[in-house]
């Protein structure tokens, strides 16, 4: 009997890793990168934040990704250096450091079951602040991109955090190697 529970638990944990990060409303958030291998000398590639409604009900998201034309996106971006499978260290981040006065005209994105919505994040390399002595990504290393979108208006009185992650590696693409 204990063996059955262990097998069931292992099965559920493997499925959870494949599902990605899903909020309590059934919306899964994932990151799709233009390139998952690039040279450290190249600009950080553009990526998409993808929201997929895997639930059974229609859901609405607060359309707050680019609230101000002249500022960066209203999301948090973090890059972690993957030291081991479990251990990682933050090497770069972008946090929106501006306040927005909310008016009466709020825009929402409606996702029916099975629908998805993509948000293109361009020129993230201009937004990132690198930490540590090297202040850059290093060739030959593996990293994880983590993007966080906080929605406090999609459902009245409910604050949700959507997290998307994607692994990538930085490789030397020099023609002289």
Language model features: what each stretch is:
Residues 37-43:
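Short, solvent-exposed loop/linker segments at the N-terminal edge
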């Amino acid at each position: 009997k204990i063996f059955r529970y262990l097998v069931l638990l292992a099965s559920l944990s493997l499925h959870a890793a494949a599902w990605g990060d899903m909020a309590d409303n059934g919306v899964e958030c994932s990151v799709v990168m233009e390139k998952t291998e690039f040279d450290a000398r190249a600009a950080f590639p553009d990526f998409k934040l993808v929201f997929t409604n895997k639930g059974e009900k229609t859901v609405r998201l607060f359309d707050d990704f680019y609230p101000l034309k002249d500022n960066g996106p209203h999301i948090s971006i973090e890059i972690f250096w993957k030291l081991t499978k479990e251990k990682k260290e933050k090497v770069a981040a972008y946090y929106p450091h501006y306040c927005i006065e909310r008016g009466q005209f709020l825009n929402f994105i409606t996702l029916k079951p099975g629908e998805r919505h993509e948000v293109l994040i361009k020129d993230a390399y201009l937004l990132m602040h690198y930490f540590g002595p090297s202040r850059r990504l290093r060739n030959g290393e593996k990293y994880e991109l983590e993007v966080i979108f906080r929605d406090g208006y999609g459902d009245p009185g409910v604050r949700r955090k959507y997290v998307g992650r994607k692994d990538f590696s930085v490789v030397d693409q020099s023609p002289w190697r």
